[in-house]
Amino acid sequence: LYFHTDASQGAGQIDIHPQRLGVDMMTLNAGKVYGPKQVGLLWAASSVALQPLIAGGGQERGLRSGTENVAGTVGFAKALQLAVAHQRGEFARLSRVKQAFLSTITELLVDEVMILSPRKGCLPSHVSLSIPGIDAERVLFLLEMKQMYVSTGSACAANKGTRSHVLAGIGLDDTAIAGSLRITFGRYSTEETAKRGAQLLAEVVRHEQQRQKSRKWGAQ
């Protein structure tokens, strides 16, 4: 039985050395460290007997045939090198950015917002929250109109049209899951933009609450 981890989100923020983590396989994504898009990495321990899925020219030690993206691979290596070199400072900076967002949103939506991310042991670039009773898909659309971009889940699960089994697994009901959002911060995020983002989110939530009240009054 092999243990694989997708450590893409942690690259450049925390120590993801595969041998220190004790994993058998690890994948990384160049885009997460501001490298070339559509370039990935698979690390496998020597004890893992990988079998090729693509036959042909025998590139990449016979494991994945096809012309290699040399420029993309070199770019990925450099981007990862730079991310690791600035890891400690970036972790501290993003922690301040995240705290600025959390302080602002919990002040503006003190009675509405549920912060799902743990305060400790969590990446500084991510916040998971829920506003029960609000349709997160509508919030996402309204925020896009204000040029603020968030998500309702991971990119690989966003289009499945089903509720998050992860949020259900930690005990959230359907109302809380339907109101869940994921906010991420990056290299170009600042404490000021984080505060402004929290303000925009609060404005949209207030707008939706008022819309719901108007619909209820209209129905009566």
Regions of interest found by a model, annotated:
Residues L1-Q220:
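Pyridoxal 5′-phosphate
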